[in-house]
Amino acid sequence: MIINEKANDIVTNLEDAERFSINADASMFAILSKKLYSNPIQSVIRELVSNAIDANIAAGVEIPIQVHFPNTLDNIFYVRDSGIGMDENELRNVFTYGGSNKRDSNAQIGGLGVGAKSPFSITESFTVESAKNGVKRTALCFMGPDGRPRFKMIGEENTSESGTKIYFSVADGYANFIRESVPVFLFSVQMPEILNGVETFCNVADVKNIEEFRKLRKLVEKDSHFCRPHMVGPDKNEYIVTKLLNITSQFFSGNIVVMGGVPYDVDISQVWSENYKVSQMFNFDNYSKVAIFHFPIGSLAFQASREKLNYTEDTKKQLQKRYV
């Protein structure tokens, strides 16, 4: 994603002024990892899934990414893509805070240079396997005794595959990973291949299995538009829509925008000075009060955690255009 940071023109005669710098100590890395996300599990799933989808898009492959959920028999969580992979230099760049190879195009979702390191918010170490040009490289990312993250290449072997896999073990709370993946997968650009024999995809909104969840996704995809909101109402499919409404109400306030497959709550009070309600603006009396707005990648600003929108003047203008 192209990051639009505007440079400020300042006229000054202070020629000896020094630039600010960042002290890369343990407290700073804690801010960038363990303290960055309010919902770490959902954020890790979102960031790794988004990166994997980006990798597939860049490689032009239509093979779905793989997501492996932990359980009592196999406690590994992983996300795997079928992209072009990374060599050692590319791995070192991606796993440097602020490092990103996605800032020249809005075809990909990421770009801030923190998402690949998101597992540090819930684990002390994770492993990266990346295959490119016939060589698979394995790197270990771990938190050092000084509280600063470390990166070490630990293996290299020949392979006919390509792509990247990021994985780590989960001690407990397996069901939380399944639950927190719901809002990520509901709007994601690709529906991943879900592994590890998960029979109950989620325990919310009476969605009992993956097939019912896929029906919800089809409804969202069928009615997705990039110009005007669509209002999901019982007149379309009461059985499915009711479940969609139940799901969104558990994770969102009701006003949702989606950019690059990532959903965000909209705080209407941030968009207008008056406290408008979407239900009043759209006369939702005969609908289920769910409006989904789709925006092109790069059109809205978001916070560093990507959990919430950043209500810049440009973002507010974009939102105002859709709400009228």
Show which residues each predicted segment covers.
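Activation segment of protein kinase catalytic domains, centered on the conserved DFG
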Residues: 27-35, 39
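Short acidic loop-to-helix transition motifs that present clustered carboxylates
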Residues: 27, 72, 112
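Glycine-rich phosphate-binding loop
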Residues: 105-123
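Helical mechanochemical/support elements of P-loop NTPase systems and associated helical scaffolds
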Residues: 40-45, 90, 110, 122, ...
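Glycine-rich ATP-binding loops of the HATPase_c
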Residues: 124-129
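Conserved ATP-binding N-box helix of the HATPase_c
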Residues: 36-67, 115-120
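Interdomain "switch/hinge" adjacent to the Bergerat
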Residues: 1-22, 55-109, 135-324
